Amino acid sequence: PLPAIVFGGRRAKPAPLVYQSKSWDNGVFVGPIMASETTAAATGAVGVVRRDPMAMRPFCGYHMGDYFAHWIEMGKKVKNPPKIFNVNWFRLDDEGHFLWPGFGENMRVLEWIVKRCEEKVGAVETPIGYVPDPKDINLEDSGVSEETLKELLTVDKETWKQEADGIEEFYKQFGDRLPKELSDELATLKANLNK
């Protein structure tokens, strides 16, 4: 069986280096809110958040709300659905430098994902999901300090409150075809951010 599904976006701030969803429905919520910030390689303004649900926007041949509902239903049909993770290799510091080296170093994060699926490591609960305990990411010879890793794994509630507002606005386009489970997950996220 498939143990994990990994989504990813390109965000300067909100998304941590990696986080695990709290449940299948929560993971399906994470997929549609995937976003990247436009770069100089794209036409238009730089730094604009562009949402691309599950990286399928250009490829989905039917209503995305129905596509999300299909994912929700899959989770009900599978006895042990895969764990869902989100990665963000592109987090920046306040000076605009990448905090994570990327490329082959990404294997360090994938190793944590595999260990989570095998129940060999724990995690720290946050309002958005589970992030690694910094001690569970092997930093040996990576050039990344423990302090930088902690910054990479930080979930800033105020930034995520703004993100939640953006998600709510994004979801409006799906109208009544947005699965209730995703609306419920958004409400839960907002409640978690206000604790």
Question: What is each PLM-predicted segment?
Answer:
Residues P1-K195:
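Conserved NTP phosphate-binding and transfer environment spanning the P-loop NTPase/kinase superfamily
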